[in-house]
């Protein structure tokens, strides 16, 4: 059991019988009395995010999770399949459990499988991935005056904003935490 005051973003806890990843933590302290810890928790089995408030001093159970290196191999529309880098064993994860992460997966993407009781319950992406631009408008001379960028659709269907000089067919590096363009690859 850990004190809720020590919760931080990215931790895994057991709450109401399910495993959650801590997405956000805000600590509010009152003049008198105990503090309030507001958290956003993502349920790893359903993918839903819920807000939970704790009083300081409360305790929660830390989930026992392990990470295994794996690579994404394919999906069949319902399940996404990954191969363990050490044992070459294949694991399937339902699409609903990796709803946010699936837009960054192309064949052979290296990920960390989040394992609990020997079963995969989610994935952790690298901080950035390289994806190909499949659709964007051509840039025009003088476009840079307004700054900003233009919309682009990547090979996975992800929509991001890219600088005007990026063209269709080029590869770009995307931050998986924010979904933003980093650089041309």
UniProtKB/Swiss-Prot annotation:
Pfam families named in the record: EFP, EFP_N, Elong-fact-P_C
GO terms (BP aspect): peptide biosynthetic process
Entry-linked SMART domains: EFP (SM01185), Elong-fact-P_C (SM00841)
Source taxon at top rank: Bacteria
Keywords: Cytoplasm, Elongation factor, Protein biosynthesis
InterPro entries: Elong-fact-P_C (IPR015365), NA-bd_OB-fold (IPR012340), Rib_uL2_dom2 (IPR014722), Transl_elong_fac_P/YeiP (IPR020599), Transl_elong_KOW-like (IPR013185), Transl_elong_P/YeiP_cen (IPR001059), Transl_elong_P/YeiP_CS (IPR013852), Transl_elongation_fac_P (IPR011768)
A GO cellular component annotation in the UniProt record: cytoplasm
Name of the molecule in the record: Elongation factor P
Name of the gene this protein is made from: efp
């Amino acid at each position: 059991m850990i004190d809720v005051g020590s919760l931080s973003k990215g931790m895994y806890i057991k709450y109401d019988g399910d495993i959650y990843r801590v997405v956000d933590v805000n600590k509010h302290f009152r003049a008198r009395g105990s503090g309030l810890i507001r958290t956003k928790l993502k349920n790893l089995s359903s993918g839903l995010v819920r807000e939970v408030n704790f009083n300081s001093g409360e305790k929660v159970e830390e989930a026992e999770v392990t990470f295994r290196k794996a690579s994404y191999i394919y999906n069949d529309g319902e399940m996404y399949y990954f191969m363990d880098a050490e044992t070459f064993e294949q694991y399937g994860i339902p699409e609903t459990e990796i709803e946010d992460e699936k837009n960054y997966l192309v064949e052979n993407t290296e990920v960390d499988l989040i394992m609990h009781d020997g079963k995969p319950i989610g994935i952790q992406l690298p901080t950035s991935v390289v994806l190909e631009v499949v659709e964007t408008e051509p840039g025009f001379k003088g476009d840079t005056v307004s700054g900003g960028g233009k919309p682009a659709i990547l090979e996975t269907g992800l929509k991001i904003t890219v600088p005007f000089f990026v063209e269709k067919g080029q590869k770009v590096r995307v931050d998986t935490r924010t979904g933003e363009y980093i650089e041309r690859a």
